[in-house]
Amino acid sequence: FDLINNRNFYKNGSDKFMKFYSRKMVAAKDLNSNGSLFGGRLLAWIDEEAFIFTTCQLKDPSVVTRYISNIEFLSTARIGDIVEIGMEVVDMGRTSITLACVVRKKGTEKIITQIDKIVFVLVGHDGQPKPHYQKVKFIDEAI
């Protein structure tokens, strides 16, 4: 993703723009033994935000995380820093939705991590995938 004019949008190769709606402040409880943001805490934030984004898109909270692609931590955050989590839909399957995610530090817009694929699957009461019958919506329309 490339930062566009230092704004709150990232542009990927298909000319889509990613918006950042979720922010978290790094607190003492979020730090590792090195004094920086614990990777596990960040992954929990990402999974939670992806769940919220997905349920808004599919209009159904009966989703499970199926897959998260490779994660590389490119930079870190420290106590008091604000991190922003951006999501966008990259694919919509019959029972699934695939998202891309960028996490950056507010103010510097330095990327902490980016994830190319987070896949959620809509499931029925039996735990089996079920069709969602939804089309991609922009986040403004979904929330």
Where do the language-model regions lie?
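HotDog/MaoC-like acyl-thioester-processing domains
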Residues: F20-Y21, F73, R78-I79, V90-I143
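A contiguous binding-surface segment within folded domains or other stable secondary-structure elements
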Residues: I52-D91
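Hot-dog-fold acyl-thioester-processing enzymes
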Residues: G13-T65, V121-I143
